[in-house]
Amino acid sequence: ILGHVDVVPCSGNWICDPFKPEIIDGKLYGRGVLDDKGPLLACLHAVKILKAMGLPLQKRIRFIVGANEETDWKCMDYYFNQKKIPAPQMSFTPDAVFPLIYAEKGVFQYQLVTDITEELVLSGGNAFNAVADHASVLLPEEMEAVIRKNLLSWETQTNCHFRLDRMDSSLRLTAEGVAAHAAHPSTGINAISGLMKAVSELPLQNELSRIAAFYMKYIGFDLTGKGLGIDLSDEISGKLSFNVGKVEVQDYKVIFSIDNRVPVTYRCMQVQELIQKHLSGSGFRFENPNATESIHIPKDSFLVQALLESYRTVVGDSSAMPLVDGACSYARALDNCVAFGAL
């Protein structure tokens, strides 16, 4: 049983301490209570109950707890490749939904980068694999009237909340969205997209206006990568998903950090080639790719059928079928592993 105890970075919008679990109205709040600390503890208690019942087991049950699942999985590399610990014959990770996930899309993360020649204060989001729930930019103070005139319209168009603050000799425009996992970007509201929409409508003639124009042409609010020519799909896993998780300025470079979930019949290199082709002449370049290819365990395999039958029997839902998801779980770390629960 594979689980993880690391978490995605926290935004500043928590109403309680995210690292001090708190029960409110019968629900447990804290970073990672669902992903994946709670499910991992549930599995530990389940095995403890089996042990207390004295049930005979034909196989040994092993728990593997990682702390690098949300980033680059160095924990799995260390455990299996450096320490040379034998992999289990079959496994599940309680890091998704019931009844189970038999196929996971590929995860392709990369950056779109452009050089700038002037000072620019622009930032937003926290990580590749989360929908950005905040983004802000500094603007000249002479823009105040036109910004205030358009605030309500921008909120209506983008579903973001906008705030304008006076600084010493400039204005800070902030967009607030709704965070979500990059595997399901439609469940969130991307503040970076909202901010770029607003900036693109301002009468600016500078690097910022160029960047906003690029964003709206090649990305915008589309969640399938159509503007970059990567709106791919297949019968097994559906459409590619596209998320802008972060924007930052470093060393006179503007960097957008992107996360794609790639249909299982495509390879990440195919996506890269399409993006590079479409970026030609845009002023932006493709950098720092990191690919985790898809997995697909056959529906008729013993592992899938055993877990599926267990779920159907316990829950009483004989019509439940295995699912495909864009999330990336530890199921990819092993040859015969699926995500099973815990939601």
Regions of interest found by a model, annotated:
Residues 2-65, 71:
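Active-site metal-coordination/substrate-binding segment of hydrolases
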Residues 4-8, 14, 139, 168-169, ...:
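Short glycine-enriched loops at secondary-structure junctions
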Residues 6, 85, 151-161, 202-206, ...:
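A common structural junction motif
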Residues 21-23, 112, 162-164, 244-247:
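A structural signal for short hydrophobic beta-strand segments in well-ordered beta-sheet cores
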Residues 40-50, 79, 139, 195-199, ...:
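Buried hydrophobic packing segments
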Residues 57-188:
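Histidine/acidic-residue-rich, glycine-tolerant segments that coordinate divalent metal ions
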Residues 176-179, 183-251, 257, 261-270, ...:
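An extended, acidic, His-containing surface patch that forms the Zn2+-binding/catalytic region
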